[in-house]
């Protein structure tokens, strides 16, 4: 077994590497709150001061492809 320790979880690595664009920092933070901390859309919307509809749109745009990449990497 390899004793190598990752600095990031696999999902956090994907979020940091694959989420790019004009508002990437905000989108990365939203995805980390959802996938790494397990918060609901409503909780994230309150923290980020956005509507839960906007949060859902971002999570579905980026999150679904990230989950697929994570599943393929295992």
Residue ranges and their predicted role:
Residues 37-43:
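A short, glycine-centered helix-capping/turn motif at helix boundaries
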């Amino acid at each position: 077994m390899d004793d190598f320790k990752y600095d990031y979880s696999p999902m956090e690595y994907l979020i940091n590497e694959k989420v790019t664009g004009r508002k990437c920092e905000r989108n990365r933070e939203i995805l980390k709150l959802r996938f790494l901390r397990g918060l609901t859309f409503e909780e994230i919307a309150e923290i980020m001061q956005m509507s839960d509809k906007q949060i859902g749109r971002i999570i579905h745009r980026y999150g679904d492809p990230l989950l697929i990449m994570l599943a393929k990497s295992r």
